[in-house]
Amino acid sequence: MTIDTRALGFGSSERAVYAADPWTTRGRLYQEDGSPTRSDFQRDRDRIVHTTAFRRLKHKTQVFIAQDGDHYRTRLTHTIEVAQIARALARALKLDEDLAEGVALVHDFGHTPFGHTGEDALHEVLLPYGGFDHNAQSLRIVTKLERRYAEFDGINLTWESLEGLVKHNGPLLTADGVGTRGPVPQPILDYCELHDLELATYASLEAQVAAIADDIAYNTHDIDDGLRSGYLTFDMLEEIPFLAGLMAEVRARYPHLEPSRFTHEIMRRQITRMVEDVIGVAQQRLSLLRPESAADIRAADRVIATFSEGMAETDRQIKAMLFKRIYRNPDIMRIRAGAAQIVTDLFAAYMANPKEMQSHYWVDHIAGLSDAPKARHVGDYLAGMTDTYAISAHRRLFDHTPDLR
């Protein structure tokens, strides 16, 4: 993908006309005085970093459970990697870097312990009460569950940050009001009654670069962790033409490189090529669209920050390899089954006896509730757990806790 380097931003450039503007934000649900030293998007990013939910990401994992080793990615390290890539993309495209970084930092807040396995298990037990969606849970955390301020629940982010959180993967509704990926989760609909996030339009370009940064980070670090664990080998990587090309480049330049350095050289190149591909596609689409404001980005009929056809095919090949070699590996499947059992057991135990939650706040809020609202509170409590806390809670309540190693 060809890039026009003359059009790139390098940190000192003014924002493009299509960038989100923190000085003309659509505001916050609760009116606040502005800051003399920080823009509204800077304040959003700072509020996100200071939340309890952000700190909990340190002990939430994605594929490899926390007990597997100290060097595997957690939700926190993944989030930091996504934020770095999102900020680099935003800088190159002359966007608001603080908004892009904020969306990247908050995008995983709603994830449960044990990654997608925990989410699937929690969704299953909550199905009679509306199910569970991590994106909707992220919104609940920043608008309701975080309790840090005297005047409101949540952290009162700007409309643009919340829009990016909810719509970073694209519109949730068609123009006719039909869900683009199934029914829109009720918590999102409820919030839109108060503060319409315009679910039928695309999000800002800042949110779009955060979304594609998530894909880039996932693909890269799951390969890195897969090689570290032994579930992937260099021979497996060479089955994908893009990765085979990167490996050939590294071998040609460093013919006697040790395996760990060889891996990192591949990963560096993978991130760079994918980032450059996205920049090139975005430049092409922006030149065709000729947007004059952030509103023009939202009104566009397609995403702007995305992979080229060739890189999208590479993305599919990498995901297929990871699914086959890691996510469906028998060892990982055994661990996933145990993790799902922990979530299911804890939900049943807390529904039967909320006092087992050992938290006055949650117990006081559940007292006297019917099953549906009680289940939602229990779901909130479980979703906020880290891997390590969920394991210890299960050990306290049950005679046998699955071995997740």
Curated annotation (Swiss-Prot):
UniProt superkingdom: Bacteria
Key words, A-Z: Hydrolase
InterPro entries on file: dGTPase, dGTPase-like, dNTPase_2, HD/PDEase_dom, HD_domain, PHydrolase_assoc_dom
SUPFAM superfamilies in alphabetical order: HD-domain/PDEase-like (SSF109604)
Gene Ontology MF terms in the entry: dGTPase activity
One BP term from GO: dGTP catabolic process
PROSITE patterns for the chain: HD
All residue ranges annotated as the HD domain in the record: 75-219
CDD domains membership: HDc
Keyword Hydrolase: yes
Similarity field: Belongs to the dGTPase family. Type 2 subfamily.
Name this polypeptide is given: Deoxyguanosinetriphosphate triphosphohydrolase-like protein
